[in-house]
Amino acid sequence: MKISLLTTAVLMISWLSTQARGLEEIFAERGYVSVTAIEPDIMVSLMYARDDNFTGVVLYDDGIKDAWLHPDAAKALAKAQRELSSLMPGCHLLVKDAARPMSVQRRMFNAVKGTPKA
């Protein structure tokens, strides 16, 4: 019983510290990089940071606005943006989705569970 309570307390503290830090800090700690930090010409409009997505609600509660990706993916997008800019000056890539926490993935799954979208 004591071990179970201790485990529960540790998990709760871990969860609370994760909530307080914010997604962007957690993504950075896990090695993801901000797409716009790598290439400022890439535009970002995250679908799940707005309510005009398939769930109808904002899923990023802490106001995340930047796209966080694996460094290799971010570098590849930056290379593509540079190529696009050389071929079509003034045109920009638009990132609509990127790394997302499992909590958001669960909310998405629950939003479509039992519907034809599932």
Predicted regions mapped to residue ranges:
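Sec-dependent signal peptide recognition
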Residues: 2-9
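Hydrophobic h-region of N-terminal signal peptides that target proteins for export
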Residues: 9-19
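Extracytoplasmic cell-surface/polysaccharide-interacting catalytic and binding patches
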Residues: 19-98, 106-118
